[in-house]
Amino acid sequence: MTGETQLRARRTRIKILKAIAGLNRSAGFSEIRDATGLSTGSIYYHLERMNKYVTKDLRQYRITDEGLRLLSEIGVKSVVSN
């Protein structure tokens, strides 16, 4: 992966994390798609690689404590103060 591709992937994954965190730390796939504007394929691709930050429980994706820590570290405090 090139540096530019890695940066784009990170930005996409942060966008997904922010969307889930902003939806009370739990969201269905359609909610993630609507909140991010990303394609179905892109969301699935990234969610598969984010198991440290997002878990799937039945039909909901939930942000993990590690995902909340990451958002806090990058300065996204408004969505993680639950």
Describe the role of every protein-language-model region.
Residues L17-I20, L47:
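Hydrophobic structural patches
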Residues R25-A35:
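Short acidic, hydrophobic short linear motifs in intrinsically disordered regions
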Residues G67-N82:
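Conserved segment of winged-helix/HTH DNA-binding domains
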